[in-house]
């Protein structure tokens, strides 16, 4: 490929990262959304037709485009990660199957003599790409929860309050992600290196991207179908 990496043999996410997304990131907010209070103007709306199912045109449209949105943002994070310039890459070493930043390891020369090996730049790029994809997917889904609470009104009008269970679930899920990022032993389990500053800025931007995109769709009234 352009970056010297054969992308046919790597994946944007590792199995342990996917498991975390399914069990923690998705589960907690989903349960809390079940007790989200009704919208204030709900009694002013026309009653739904009896034959109208759950999967309306509008809901189907949002599932499709918002799912693709999250998917593309995650893939973009991975691609940006593997495109990190060589001069910004951290030095990494593999010890007993786990990857460490060289700065975290004492007696590097002795570790290498004992069988550890320094990662080449291509391997480091893959590690950074997978880390960015995981962080972006985990946190952007939590951010996106606030988008889906109201299909028409801006998040800046509805706010993020009104459901303490939801706010707590998102806070816990986000805090657990940061625990993984801050504790070296957990970072090693999830194969997440310490990201360069430029990658951190790019990651934060992608995490917030769902709010920008959905707000634009709401502004131009294309987040909903005509019959909604």
Indicate where each model-derived feature is located.
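C-terminal transmembrane module of polytopic membrane proteins
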Residues: 34, 90-112, 119, 130-131, ...
